[in-house]
Amino acid sequence: MQFNFYKYQGTGNDFVVIDNRNLSFPKENHGWVKQICDRRFGIGTDGLMLLENTTDADFKMVYYNADGNESTMCGNGGRCISAFAKKLGMVSDNGTFLAIDGIHEFILKEADVQLKMINVDKINIEKDDYILFTGSPHYVSFRNEIDKIDIVSEARKIRYNEIYSKEGINVNFVEDLSADRQEKDGKIYMRTYERGVEDETLSCGTGTVAVALCFAEKNNLEKGKVEILTPGGNLSVSFTKEGSIFTNIWLQGAAKLVFQGTIDID
């Protein structure tokens, strides 16, 4: 079978996007999804997204990890599929889509996409680390000099421990750059190991949101905008905290079409 595809990236987190409004893509064939995502035998991507029709919003987003399995919310993927919907002429400069965790609003401004995320009402603290759900599950650990950490090795100790091994968890290591005066504007730097990809990715949208909220929790911030540096580029997260609940959470950053083409799936 042959399909048209579009390759997008949001701060280095890359995705294959397919217009599946005619429901022709065989979603039950996880092997095909895995093949498309393979960087040697397919197109190569962190995940695959299908854009489909829905009566609840402008469109529906269906997201698969690189391992071929349908997964939870992907923030950078949400920003990229919003840009794709505009390319298809389905929306103009704003709209909504239905994802696995509910309805998301988005705003498109030139190359940037702002995406509203779900509210977060609980952050668990385990010693000095944080566990929370921002559409996907995340483990956040503040460390020093994270570029010296073997991310894959260290993250797998957490991702595959007896607590998280069954469902999996994304693991984020975070460094406060303002703490050692490398940055004057309070930026923080993060690296992420993603379940389903089972490797470090250049960026993670739901992870960026998780890190921003943990930074806010750690520093008693009730509202504001946190600038975050990832290996793939800059993202920002704005939020308001009402009591113990984080609301009005917006993830912002670039989303770009890299190339498009057709692929034959055997």
Question: PLM features: what roles do these ranges have?
Answer:
Residues 1-110, 140-266:
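A glycine-rich beta-to-alpha transition motif near the start of alpha/beta enzyme domains, typified by
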